[in-house]
A protein has these predicted regions:
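Residue-level detection of the helix-turn-helix DNA-binding "recognition helix"
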Residues: 23, 37-38, 53, 64, ...
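Short basic helix-loop element that most often maps to the first helix and adjoining turn
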Residues: 16-37, 91
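A short, Lys/Arg-rich alpha-helix, primarily the initiator
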Residues: 1-25
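Short, charged recognition helix plus adjacent turn
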Residues: 2-8, 68, 78-96
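DNA major-groove recognition helix of helix-turn-helix/homeodomain DNA-binding modules
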Residues: 55, 59-76
């Protein structure tokens, strides 16, 4: 059975949100991968690149890990609409 795809044919729906968060933190893809690895998560630069270009599926554990690392809601990562708590931490987040 083929896996579902996003409306634009991508393999995930968090690509734009992950890139926006990473950029707001002033991190390169390599920097983010290193920080996630230090937190005990199995991410490398290529994984970050593939997620941000919608060329990789993201599982629930990875979604939770990214949400926890950045301190944002699942709904922001999934829907691109920041909650008031997300905006307190990242005031420049715009709905994507």
């Amino acid at each position: 059975m083929e896996k579902l795809r996003s409306n634009n044919g991508g393999k995930n729906i968090i690509a734009d949100q992950l890139k926006a968060l990473r950029n707001q933190c002033g991190l390169s893809q390599r920097d983010l991968a290193g920080k996630l690895q230090l937190a005990g998560l199995n991410f490398d630069k290529n994984i970050i690149t593939r997620i941000e270009t919608s060329n990789r599926f993201v599982n629930d554990f990875e979604l939770k890990s990214l949400s926890n690392y950045f301190g944002v809601s699942y709904s922001y990562l999934l829907d691109g609409i920041p909650t008031s708590e997300d905006l307190e931490k990242y005031p420049d987040l715009l709905p994507l």
